[in-house]
């Protein structure tokens, strides 16, 4: 049986990040949301100048994340990343660790919670396509970490998505609870833990965790609108990053950090399960072709 650990109500409220929609409103105002919604619904490209500005804001959001204190700081320095105070997010992480020790009286469980949390950033792109306890600690087994995992989920510090064994309704009946992926609740915290060079993000350079960061960002945005999120893989190498259920049924979502046109796994899923359409989230403009709806990374929050 999983033990229940109390989580401070005030701390939980304070730790919830702003999503990118809220970040956009704070930077450009409400009107931009309605403009984006029109282009999203009609799959028509937005003007290049606005597209590029929104991509720049997306990359800025990757750096600072959505924690209110972090957003307030970047806005106070007119969005100048060189003047941004990185210590704000580091202090938030320290606060998380303090909460663990405050509310979890069992020292062993505290260590397990911290070990899971610290292992997530480097497991997002795990080649095994699932979270592995052996990556948390050598010889670790799931039964020993079940309580620690539940504490992190209950505290909303992390999000979990389960493997969907078959794309059938209801999806909850076809998920594999033993095979899952974990994401951090805030992409800014992820970048802080990984100690990513902000210049690489802002200038859209290639670096080792670029794809993983984009996926964590997308999961964070989807998590606002969907109670259940899944992923899919076959017995070979094909994998679809996210599966959501909306009014159109089960919809596969592929994430690309750049503007890659390749969608091998997404196309394979579409051929096999015949969804109404698939979604590709990348740095390209809005569009629709061959059954795939292309959505810019900055418009992920519009998926509902």
Can you annotate each of these PLM segments?
Residues 1-122:
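Interdomain motor-coupling "hinge/lid" segment immediately C-terminal to the ATP-binding subdomain
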């Amino acid at each position: 049986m999983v033990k229940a650990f109390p989580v401070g109500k005030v701390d939980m409220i304070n730790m919830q990040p702003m999503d990118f929609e809220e970040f956009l409103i704070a930077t450009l105002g409400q009107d931009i949301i309605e403009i984006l919604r029109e282009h999203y619904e009609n799959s028509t490209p937005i003007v290049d100048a606005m597209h590029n500005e929104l991509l720049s804001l997306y990359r800025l959001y990757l750096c600072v994340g959505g924690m209110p204190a972090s957003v307030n700081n970047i806005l106070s320095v007119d969005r100048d990343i060189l003047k941004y105070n990185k210590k704000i997010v580091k202090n938030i992480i320290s606060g998380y660790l303090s909460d663990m020790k405050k509310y979890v009286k069992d020292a062993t469980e505290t260590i397990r919670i911290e070990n899971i949390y610290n292992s997530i950033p480097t497991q997002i792109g795990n080649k095994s396509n699932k979270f592995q306890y052996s990556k948390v600690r050598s010889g670790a087994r799931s039964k020993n970490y079940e309580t620690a995992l539940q504490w992190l989920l209950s505290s909303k510090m992390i999000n979990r998505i389960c493997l969907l064994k078959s794309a059938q309704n209801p999806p909850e009946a076809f998920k594999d609870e033993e095979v899952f992926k974990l994401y951090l609740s805030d992409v800014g915290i992820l970048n802080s833990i990984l100690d990513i060079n902000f210049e690489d993000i802002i200038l859209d350079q290639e670096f080792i965790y670029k794809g993983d960061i984009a996926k964590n960002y997308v999961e964070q945005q989807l998590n606002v609108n969907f109670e259940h999120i899944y992923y899919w893989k076959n017995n070979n190498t094909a994998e679809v990053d996210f599966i959501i259920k909306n009014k159109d049924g089960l919809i596969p979502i592929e994430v690309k950090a750049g503007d890659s046109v390749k969608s091998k796994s997404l196309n394979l899923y579409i051929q096999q399960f015949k969804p109404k359409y698939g979604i590709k989230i990348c740095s390209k403009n809005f569009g629709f072709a061959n059954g795939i709806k292309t959505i810019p990374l900055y418009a992920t929050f519009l998926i509902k």
